[in-house]
Amino acid sequence: MSHDSDARHGARLAAVQALYQMELAGGGAEEVAEEFIAHRFGETPTDEDFFKSILEGVPARQSEIDKAIAACLTESWTLARVDSILRAILRAAALELVARRDVPARVVIDEYVGIAHEFFAGDEPGFVNAALDRMARRKRAKEFGLPTPDDELDF
């Protein structure tokens, strides 16, 4: 990995942890971002601006992001049933898929499946891969050589 990709990976991992903290303990994006930057950054390279864009973007677009995630889950799963760290992973990835067209969909999927592997040893990374692949094919159909579905225009 290059320094830039390491820094982006660090930002994604920190954003997932911060989103998890926000969901469990409360607190706004700005407050949590300040805490992470002051106390948790430094050990690994982290792109602070990228981190903040994810951390601020998810709450700002949460209802539409959650709708996009729910549409990619199987009928037997609801977003509320998904483990809270998996929810944070899916939300951060969904934000990138809908708001960061400069990042290829396959990179987003690979990065967040990798992050899922950092937290889980079981089937969860496969779950993340399947959900994000479905979402990417709907939201970024052109990148996969697919016809553009109507819901790609939802965001």
Regions found by a protein language model. Give the residues of each.
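N-terminal interaction/assembly modules
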Residues: 1-155
